[in-house]
A protein has these predicted regions:
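Active-site beta->alpha N-cap acidic-glycine motif
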Residues: 1-59, 66-70, 90-95, 99-121, ...
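Alpha-helical scaffold elements lining the catalytic groove of polysaccharide deacetylases
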Residues: 14-16, 67-98, 148-221
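His/Asp/Glu-enriched short active-site or ligand-binding loop at hydrolase and phosphoryl-transfer sites
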Residues: 65-69, 125-150, 175-180, 195, ...
Length: 274
């Protein structure tokens, strides 16, 4: 399984990008169209475009109301801060994009700055199913999504992160760091990267294509944990060669006939269904 996610506002600046990537002609082996997950922030969002993505079967999740430009605000946020930002964002999406099916159940924190127990207490109280803000450091074996009923199966990764320390009835759709090394066998100086756009050493389309295929193979050859490709739309819009390689990668993976591009929600259901 591969997930493609985007963070931020949805509007006329990027809706054409999403239409190019998720064209109706691209289908999973079961004949269903490939889907993405969109973590929506309120500011600058066109809710008609959000409604259209939902109509096409893509997943909508929340990325906050304010998208406040202060990482410490998210790390140290109170219960009420998280309630206003995330539950408030869901209410806005449901009202202005006319989403009435209860499908907005996921959260991603701006800057991937986890809000500790307060964030997850709010999530449980408001019936959010999953968070996708915690990063697992690059390791030999990637991490499958897990529940926070138990201790995290990896260290709390990142400077000044505020990971939960108590049990919570919430799924963590963990972000496995991508291996961005040109030569994974010899180049040990490069750390992993959380978002594709944060892989700063990837400067040309050929590098990007190699990175995508290497990380897919790394997940396939180890424990087949879902491969998450997490993007900022501006980064792809500004690098048209990268968009072309992403579309080619999707086509090549689907040609295998054993790879599915799914939403975060579908991944969270998979262990239960299996």
């Amino acid at each position: 399984m591969i997930t493609i996610t985007f963070n931020g506002a949805i509007n006329s600046d990027n809706i054409d990008l999403y239409q190019d990537i998720f064209s109706g002609e691209v289908q999973n082996p079961n004949g269903c169209q490939i889907k993405g997950s969109f973590f929506v922030s309120h500011k600058y969002t066109n809710y008609s475009a959000v409604q259209e993505l939902h109509r096409r079967g893509h997943e909508l999740a929340v990325f906050s109301v304010t998208n406040k430009d202060d990482p410490e605000y998210w790390t140290g946020g109170s219960y009420d801060d998280w309630l206003a930002e995330m539950a408030g964002s869901r209410l806005i999406i449901e009202r202005f994009a006319n989403v009435s099916d209860g499908s907005v159940i996921g959260i991603r924190a701006p800057y991937l700055r986890v809000g500790g127990n307060k964030q997850f207490e709010m999530m449980a109280d408001q019936y959010f199913v999953y968070d996708s803000s915690i990063t697992a450091p690059l390791s030999r074996v990637p991490i499958w999504p897990y529940t926070l009923y138990y201790r995290m199966p990896h260290k709390c990764h990142g400077n000044a992160q505020n990971c939960p320390s108590r049990s919570h009835p919430v799924w963590e759709m963990v972000i496995n760091e991508l291996d961005r090394r040109d030569d994974p066998f010899y180049d040990e100086s490069q750390s992993g990267c959380q978002l594709v756009s944060s892989c700063s050493n990837i400067v040309d389309p050929d590098q990007f294509a190699r990175m995508l295929r290497h990380n897919f193979q790394r997940h396939l050859d180890s424990n087949r944990a879902p491969l998450g490709l997490h993007f900022n739309a501006v980064w792809l819009k500004e690098n048209k060669g990268f968009k072309k390689e992403l579309i080619k990668f999707i086509a090549d993976m689907l040609d295998r006939n054993d790879v599915y591009f799914v939403t975060m929600l579908q991944v969270s259901i998979f262990p239960v269904a299996a």
